[in-house]
UniProtKB/Swiss-Prot annotation:
It comes from the Bacteria. Binds 1 Mg(2+) ion. This is Alkaline phosphatase. Its main location: periplasm. Mg(2+) binds at residues 77, 179, 181, 346. Zn(2+) 2 binds at residues 77, 395-396. It comes from Serratia marcescens.
Length: 475
């Protein structure tokens, strides 16, 4: 019997050692999927390589088609490939990488055109309203529309569908909560400009409560009743309802009467311990958009030639009382995960776009860094949870381009000193107006978790709706 026992013990030990070796190899390969820093000295052969080795096994191991209990969608508004690259160069260096944005293992590109309202033909440069409606509803629409198709017909949003399925829902943005990206999840209006009752009566009369419509974006936000809603836009809640049971009362008073928890600074946000349909959380941390992370000079004509390279500075207006996007994301996840049915959460870094419009490199770069930190929070939760799909993408591409440091560009330029100590010039040149414009270049979309493979290759922005809905197994 002793030899047999020895053989069995040896076989078990061999299996354990083999299992450990496979686990170690898988772990190392998994690390190779997330750590994308250059591996050595950039001047040496292979020094700029980002791959540690073959990643086939690790990619196979990352694939899963099980139902996702939770979905977290993170949007960089205006975050095209140029914006990602510029921010990475500045903050991490040419051989560095973002530990959130660059750490998702499965990556693709998607198209994001909208439709012309009259001809129904493609409009190759979308706005944030049409693009957010595309992933929120799976339907193409015209620029400016929120939650409606090209004919103005209401379309159910993913947040509404997830809520009806019993999931917790969250909506987080650094913009006004009435702005296009957050508004597309919770409202159905023919124009994105209809923030409150006053604008709606003037610009979206058919949507106004007094005309039998659903009401303004802010009124619909309250009625949709996500469990967690965080961002800016407090001033619109001061408007008075013009019709219905709340006529003559402010929307802030209406929120209180409907049981919302209202918080306005970082300490109050952290003190919240519960958010659900009985006590939904409404965090409003600015009258308008929330303050950006970094400040610096705007680009100007031949600014890279006439002015010295700059280093971005912290924005003194963003005090400790203002929660960061990462802090809002982390808190939203902590509150939403208590729902046994899971949750759907959208997070937007809004001012990449707004600072790109303003030709402000430091503002734009700082907001991209902010989004990356939020992505890191989402990924940390998803890795620990094992049942969460995380997707990172943008709504449209934008104006900024990286050009030669001393280029004589026809547009507006500014030179910055990157983490490498090297000069980098950003150029903005697609508009003679005060505001730079969007562009129609396809966008990066990356994912981690169950059903992440569905972002690989070329997809369309509307595919994102079906990918997220089907991953959660809801209809």
């Amino acid at each position: 019997m002793q030899p047999a026992v020895s053989l069995i013990a040896g076989a078990v030990l061999s299996a354990l050692l083999c299992s450990s070796a496979i686990a170690a190899e898988t772990s190392a390969n998994a690390d190779g999927l997330t750590d994308r820093a250059a591996r050595g000295n950039l001047v040496e052969p292979g020094g700029a390589r980002r791959l540690a080795g073959d990643q086939t096994t690790a990619l196979k191991a990352s694939l899963s088609d099980k139902t996702a209990k939770n979905v977290i969608l993170l949007i960089g508004d205006g975050m095209g490939d140029s914006e990602i690259t510029a921010a990475r160069n500045y903050a991490e260096g040419a051989g560095g990488y973002f530990k959130g944005i660059d750490a998702l293992p499965l990556t693709g590109q998607y198209t994001h055109y909208s439709l012309d309202r009259k001809t129904h033909k493609p409009d190759y440069v979308t706005d944030s309203a049409a693009s957010a409606t595309a992933w929120a509803t799976g339907v193409k629409t015209y620029n400016g529309a929120l939650g409606v198709d090209v004919n103005g017909k209401d379309q159910p949003t993913l947040l509404e569908i997830a809520k009806a399925a019993g999931k917790a829902t969250g909506n987080v943005s650094t913009a006004e909560l009435q702005d296009a990206t957050p508004a597309a999840l919770v409202s159905h209006v023919i124009s994105r400009k209809c923030y409150g009752p006053e604008e709606t009566s003037e610009k979206c009369a058919a949507n106004a409560l007094e005309n039998g419509g659903r009401g303004s974006i802010t009124e619909q936000l309250l009625k949709t009743r996500a469990d967690v809603t965080l961002g800016g836009g407090a001033k619109s809640f001061n408007q008075l309802a013009k019709s219905g049971e709340w006529q003559g009362k402010s929307l802030k008073d209406q929120a209180a009467a409907q049981g919302y928890q209202w918080v306005s600074n970082a300490d109050e946000l952290q003190a919240v311990t519960l958010a659900n349909q009985q006590k939904p959380l409404l965090g409003l941390f600015a009258d308008g958009n929330m303050p950006v992370r970094w400040l610096g000079p705007k680009a100007s004509y031949h600014g890279n030639l006439d002015k010295p390279a700059v280093t971005c500075e912290n924005n003194p207006a963003r005090t400790a009382a203002t929660p960061t996007l990462a802090a809002m994301t982390e808190k939203a996840i902590a509150l939403l995960k208590d729902n046994p049915n899971g949750f759907f959460l959208q997070v937007e870094g809004a001012s990449i776009d707004k600072q790109d419009h303003a030709a402000n490199p430091c503002g734009q770069i700082g907001e991209t860094v902010d989004l990356d930190e939020a992505v890191q929070k989402a990924l940390a939760f998803a890795r620990a949870d094992g049942n969460t799909l995380v997707i990172v993408t943008a709504d449209h591409a934008h104006a900024s381009q990286i050009v030669s440091a001393d280029a004589k560009a026809p547009g507006l330029t500014q030179k910055l000193t990157t983490k490498d100590g090297a000069p980098m010039t950003l150029s903005y040149g697609n508009s003679e107006e005060e505001s730079q414009g969007h562009t129609g270049t396809q966008l990066r979309v990356a994912a981690y978790g169950p059903h992440a493979a569905n972002v690989v290759g070329l997809t369309d922005q509307t595919d994102l709706f079906f990918t997220m809905r089907d991953a959660m197994g809801i209809k």
